[in-house]
Amino acid sequence: MLTYKEIEKEDLASLAAMYVETFNAPPWNDAWTPETAGTRLRQMAEAETFYGICAYEEDVLCGMVLGFAEQFYDGVLFEIKEFCVRNTSRGNGIGSEIYREFERRLRERNIENVQLMTLRGNASEHFYEKNGFETDKDLIFMKKQI
């Protein structure tokens, strides 16, 4: 059984360690360090509308989901910026369980819409589709190196 807590600044070091472990492994194969991951998570945690939860299985950190809310003319949209499940916990439904709890908590905050970005064509895309997300046909993601 999972237990949850809202993310606080004191949690960021342990979350950064899990982040490095998760995203430096396949399918991402990134090159995060504890310092760069800590900076990224701290930047998000300092946002005015930041919200996130971390999940524990038998008192061991096993996942997190976090982001921030944005006001639009027709309501509040929550942007999930990071969602990860410890590598040793993946593949047994923990990610879906964490997401369902997070969504329940967002609804309690009167947030009705969630969006995120993920890599196309890998297990993450399938995970989000399985949890009710769909590709937005009206929006595109653009980038430019400067």
Each model region followed by its residue ranges:
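Conserved GNAT-fold acetyl-CoA-binding loop/helix
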Residues: 20-42, 50
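Conserved beta-strand in the GNAT
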Residues: 54, 60-69, 79, 84
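Conserved GNAT acetyl-CoA-binding A-motif
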Residues: 99, 106-119
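Conserved beta-strand-loop-alpha-helix junction that forms the acyl-donor binding cleft
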Residues: 115-125, 143-146
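Conserved acetyl-CoA-binding loop-helix of GNAT-fold acetyltransferases
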Residues: 85, 91-104, 130
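A conserved beta-turn-beta hairpin within the catalytic core of GNAT-like acetyltransferases
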Residues: 70-80, 90, 136-138
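A short beta-loop-alpha structural element at the N-terminal edge
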Residues: 2-17
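Conserved active-site tyrosine of GNAT-family acetyltransferases
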Residues: 19, 128-129, 133
